[in-house]
C-alpha cells in the first residue's frame, strides 16, 4: 500500500517535488496559500489540504519546502500547524534554507513531540526538482533515514548523509549558497563590463561558457539577461536572505567573508532599487551606464 506523503509549499521546488512523488506512486497531499497552484496540483493527481494540520494528520512523512525559518516555524508550530497533528514516530523532512542553529532547535522541538526529523536542504533548481534529480544535504538520526529512504530516492539524484546531528545539512547548504550568490554576482559584473565595453553579449556568453571562467551559475543565469526576462525562478531577495544568513553564521564564528559581504551588498542594492521580486540575475541592474538586452515581444 502506498504511503501518504505531504508537501507543504508548492513553489518552484515544492511543486517539482510533489510531481516526482506522484510519479513514484505515493499518495501525495499538499497545502499552499495559492488556490490556483493547489488546483494545478489536484489536476496532476494530488490531494489538496486546507491547512498544514490537515496534511499532518494524514501523512507518514511531511516535507516542508517553504522559504525560510519563519515560514517553517509557522507551518509546523503555528495556528493549524502540522506538528501537533502528526502521530508520534512520523517524520518531518525540513528542506528550507535556515540557520544551522534553527535546524538544531527544530529537531529538538519535534523530538519532544515524538517526531523524527531530517535536516535536508535542497539544491538544483525547479527543473531538477520536477525530474527527481535534486541534490539533498541531509543530517539526522538513522531512524529518520529508514523512514525517508524511498521518499529521498523519488525526489533526489544525490543524497548526501552528513551525520546524525541536525544542523549539519544546513551548514553545508549555506556554504553552497555562499558560492551560488557570489557566482551570480560575479556573472552579472562580468556581463556588465562586457556591455560597457561594447562586447556583443551573446558572443561573450558563448566564449565564457567554453572557457575556464565559466560557472554553473553563469551558464544558467546569463541567458535570463540575454533574453531580458527576469521572471523569478529564484529571486533577488532570496540571496538578500541567504547571503545574510551566511554572514550571520560567519559573524557568530568571528570569521571574515569579504567576497560574500560584497555580493550581499550587490543584492541589497538591487532589492532597494525595486528589483527584489525579480529573478536573481536582475542584480545586473545595479550597474550604471549600460543598456541591457530587452525582452523580445
Curated annotation (Swiss-Prot):
Pfam families membership: NAD_binding_11 (PF14833), NAD_binding_2 (PF03446)
EC main group: oxidoreductase
Keywords: Carbohydrate metabolism, NAD, NADP, Oxidoreductase
List of residues binding NAD(+): 3-31, 97, 241
Phenotype reported upon loss of the gene: Deletion mutant is unable to use L-threonate as a carbon source.
Annotated GO MF terms: NAD binding; NADP binding; oxidoreductase activity, acting on the CH-OH group of donors, NAD or NADP as acceptor
Catalytic activity: L-threonate + NAD(+) = 2-dehydro-L-erythronate + NADH + H(+)
Family the UniProt entry places it in: Belongs to the HIBADH-related family. L-threonate dehydrogenase subfamily.
Protein name (record): L-threonate dehydrogenase
Native species: Cupriavidus necator (strain ATCC 17699 / DSM 428 / KCTC 22496 / NCIMB 10442 / H16 / Stanier 337)
Lineage: Bacteria, Pseudomonadati, Pseudomonadota, Betaproteobacteria, Burkholderiales
Gene of this entry: ltnD
Amino acid at each position: 500500500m502506498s504511503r501518504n506523503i505531504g508537501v507543504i509549499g508548492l513553489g518552484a521546488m515544492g511543486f517539482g517535488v510533489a510531481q516526482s512523488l506522484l510519479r513514484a506512486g505515493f499518495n501525495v497531499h499538499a497545502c499552499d496559500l495559492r488556490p490556483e497552484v493547489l488546483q494545478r496540483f489536484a489536476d496532476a493527481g494530488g490531494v489538496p489540504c486546507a491547512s498544514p494540520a490537515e496534511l499532518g494528520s494524514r501523512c507518514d512523512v511531511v516535507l516542508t519546502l517553504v522559504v525560510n525559518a519563519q515560514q517553517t516555524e509557522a507551518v509546523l508550530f503555528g495556528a493549524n500547524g502540522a506538528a501537533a497533528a502528526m502521530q508520534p514516530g512520523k517524520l518531518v523532512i525540513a528542506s528550507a534554507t535556515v540557520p544551522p542553529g534553527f535546524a538544531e532547535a527544530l529537531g529538538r522541538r519535534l523530538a519532544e513531540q515524538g517526531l523524527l526529523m531530517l535536516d535536508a536542504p535542497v539544491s538544483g533548481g525547479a527543473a531538477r526538482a520536477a525530474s527527481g534529480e535534486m541534490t539533498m544535504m541531509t543530517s539526522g538520526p538513522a531512524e529518520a533515514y529508514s523512514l525517508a529512504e524511498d521518499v529521498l530516492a523519488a525526489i533526489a539524484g544525490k543524497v548526501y548523509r552528513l551525520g546524525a546531528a541536525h544542523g549539519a545539512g544546513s551548514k553545508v547548504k549555506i556554504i553552497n549558497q555562499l558560492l551560488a550568490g557570489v557566482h551570480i554576482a560575479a556573472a552579472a559584473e562580468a556581463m556588465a563590463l562586457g556591455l560597457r565595453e561594447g562586447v556583443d553579449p551573446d558572443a561573450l556568453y558563448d566564449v565564457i561558457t567554453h572557457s575556464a571562467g565559466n560557472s554553473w551559475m553563469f551558464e544558467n543565469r546569463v541567458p535570463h539577461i540575454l533574453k531580458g526576462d527576469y521572471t523569478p525562478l529564484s529571486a533577488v531577495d532570496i540571496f538578500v536572505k541567504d547571503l545574510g544568513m551566511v554572514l550571520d553564521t560567519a559573524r557568530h564564528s568571528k570569521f571574515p567573508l569579504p567576497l560574500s559581504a560584497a555580493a550581499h551588498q550587490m543584492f541589497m542594492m538591487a532589492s532597494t532599487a525595486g528589483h527584489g521580486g525579480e529573478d536573481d540575475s536582475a542584480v545586473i541592474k545595479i550597474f550604471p551606464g549600460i543598456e541591457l538586452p530587452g525582452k523580445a515581444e
